[in-house]
Swiss-Prot record:
Pfam families: LOB (PF03195). Belongs to the LOB domain-containing protein family. Signal peptide: none annotated. Residues 16-119 form the LOB domain. This is LOB domain-containing protein 34. It comes from Arabidopsis thaliana.
Length: 141
């Protein structure tokens, strides 16, 4: 009798289940979307990812974008990197921004909402110069 786990993958008694399926306590199939990105030993990286992103929403967005497998690997690599950085440096930061804003819910405000008032402010040339009484006279030696 051989040992076989819930994933159906028998690897000499070791069940080769990805960190995503392990976290969600579901069967990990050979065609699992997260298997190449989160093998069993990268459980902490999956938890970092899972804090920021929804699994199903991410899968849907990547499919909607129609990325090639290479582009998909690049995107997932960036998302995983961002998640790991965010776990090390939590909280809002200029240095750490959400790389893939397409994965954000629509209710979140755009960064342009913060920049637009600055862009629309009057140019410096429209500000009148200070009164002559405040400017010291130039002296030549």
């Amino acid at each position: 009798m051989t040992l076989q786990g819930s994933s159906g993958v028998n690897n000499g008694g070791y069940v080769n289940q990805c960190a995503a399926c392990r976290h969600q306590r579901r069967r990990c199939t050979p065609d699992c979307f997260f298997r190449p990105y989160f093998p069993a030993e990268r459980h902490q990286e999956f938890q970092n990812f899972h804090r920021l992103h929804s699994n199903t929403r991410l899968q849907k967005k990547l499919k909607e974008l129609g990325l090639s497998p290479e582009e998909q690997r690049e995107a997932m690599s960036s998302i995983i990197y961002e998640s790991n950085i965010r776990s090390q440096f939590p909280g809002p930061s200029v240095a750490v921004t959400n790389t893939f804003s397409i994965f954000e819910p629509k209710s979140h405000s755009s960064p342009l909402n913060y920049v637009a008032p600055v862009i629309k402010s009057p140019p410096l040339s429209s500000i009148p110069p200070p009164p002559a009484s405040l400017i010291p006279p130039l002296t030549t030696s």
